[in-house]
Amino acid sequence: MSYEYGTGATAVGIRGAGYVVLAAEKRVSYGGFIISKTARKVYKITDYLGLALAGLFADLQAISKILRAEIEYYNIVTGRRISVRAVARLLATILYSYKYYPFLSETLVGGLEADGTAKLYVMDPLGSLIEDDYAAIGSGAPIAIGILENGYSKDMSVDDAKKLAIAAVRAAIERDAMSGDGIDLLVIRREEDSIKAEEESITI
């Protein structure tokens, strides 16, 4: 099997004042054959941090498992909460260490720091690390990014950010044959003195 047939997807991320929204569609396809219509590409890693990925599905699952294990190990050894920035830098280092046999994936890391500051990072398969306010990855990214650029503002509410993320993924689904079959969302937000992560699934 050629790798080019297993790497399609669309995922987006948006950060705002006290929140991060991650969203991705659910289709896994190989060439013209749809393997699954219910695949999860958005992962809640902790109550304050999540991933959205696009690429070869086995690699998406592997990355989420590796990161969960590394975070748990850090928590046990130090007894402290690892920051979102540190997680992003750790994952970038892990991805770069596999540069000769890379994970066929693009990754969004989003979450809230202990003080409520929202963070969103974008990574390519080799671990190049960019912090941004919004991003789109995967085969549908050229379509989704236009929707994000047109609709994003720094002072938008979390509800408006959810609507924008859904609109961006939906637009990609309509034009990208490798994306489809619904949308999974993860919303991480600050509520008073706590951070809350909410997962949602939308049928299209």
Swiss-Prot record:
Function: Component of the proteasome core, a large protease complex with broad specificity involved in protein degradation.
Name assigned to this protein: Proteasome subunit beta 1
Pfam families tied to this protein: Proteasome
Family: Belongs to the peptidase T1B family.
Organism, scientific name: Hyperthermus butylicus (strain DSM 5456 / JCM 9403 / PLM1-5)
GO cellular component terms given for this protein: cytoplasm; proteasome core complex, beta-subunit complex
Subunit architecture: The 20S proteasome core is composed of 14 alpha and 14 beta subunits that assemble into four stacked heptameric rings, resulting in a barrel-shaped structure. The two inner rings, each composed of seven catalytic beta subunits, are sandwiched by two outer rings, each composed of seven alpha subunits. The catalytic chamber with the active sites is on the inside of the barrel. Has a gated structure, the ends of the cylinder being occluded by the N-termini of the alpha-subunits. Is capped at one or both ends by the proteasome regulatory ATPase, PAN.
EC number: 3.4.25.1
Propiece residue ranges: 1-9
Reaction(s) catalysed (UniProt annotation): Cleavage of peptide bonds with very broad specificity
Regulation of this protein's activity per its record: The formation of the proteasomal ATPase PAN-20S proteasome complex, via the docking of the C-termini of PAN into the intersubunit pockets in the alpha-rings, triggers opening of the gate for substrate entry. Interconversion between the open-gate and close-gate conformations leads to a dynamic regulation of the 20S proteasome proteolysis activity.
Gene Ontology MF term list: threonine-type endopeptidase activity
Keywords, comma-separated and alphabetical: Autocatalytic cleavage, Cytoplasm, Hydrolase, Protease, Proteasome, Threonine protease, Zymogen
HAMAP family per record: Proteasome_B_A
Disulphide bond pairs: none
Source organism superkingdom: Archaea
Gene3D superfamilies with a match to the protein in the record: Glutamine Phosphoribosylpyrophosphate, subunit 1, domain 1
GO biological process, one term: proteasomal protein catabolic process
Name of the top EC class for this enzyme: hydrolase
Localization (cell): Cytoplasm
Xref: SUPFAM superfamilies: N-terminal nucleophile aminohydrolases (Ntn hydrolases)
Catalytic-site annotation from UniProt: 10 (nucleophile)
